[in-house]
Amino acid sequence: FDDAEATTPVPALVASRLEDERVIFFDKTRSDSTVHRRGRLDSVSVKLLDERARVIGFGRFVGVLTNRAMRMRPSALGILAARRARVVEALGTEPGSHTHKLALEAYDCLPLEFLLPAQLEDVRRVVASVVSAAELSQIEVVSVADPENRSFFVSVVLPRRAYEERFRGEIDRLLESRHAASQIDHRTSFLDEDLALVHFFCACESDLAPGALEGLEVEVRDLVE
């Protein structure tokens, strides 16, 4: 930053991160991977600090998460373990209770691609939906937009007995045809053998318009009910 012209405008994304308390940021870039697997390249940005703890720039690493990393429990990463504690605290569950333990497991079922860039409140909403689906044996759908990165995340949780493999393909087609998803990564996992979780990470070619995901949760629910 010291070498930048005083009149050079600061990009909106950089400005927002300067005010953000986080030090590490994870994004999906707008460039496609040409190795390892199909999809958007991953980007990790780290704030660079001077001896007085002032931000003087960002370091950036671009690549793709390895299959091993994608299979890791999120709480095995220090930065995400700390966030898990904050998310569960925000839910207000009683430590040691069934709901508290369920919330911890629900967090660890979420994909790294969502947890690393997501805001705390968005993670809390998704974890709360998993807990609700488990305790009430019902279908829960939550969508989270990330306009800065032209992407969005969809969490679909339903009783395992109601889960069918065809749902993923049908939801993929819906996301592509009605919500302009150009690339879709999905993960399927099961919680306590009673709950199926299907998560979709979607990248778009153009900017997400305000209200772009309006109606999406109802549309997805209609497909799986």
Predicted segments — roles?
Residues 1-225:
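Non-catalytic interaction/regulatory segments
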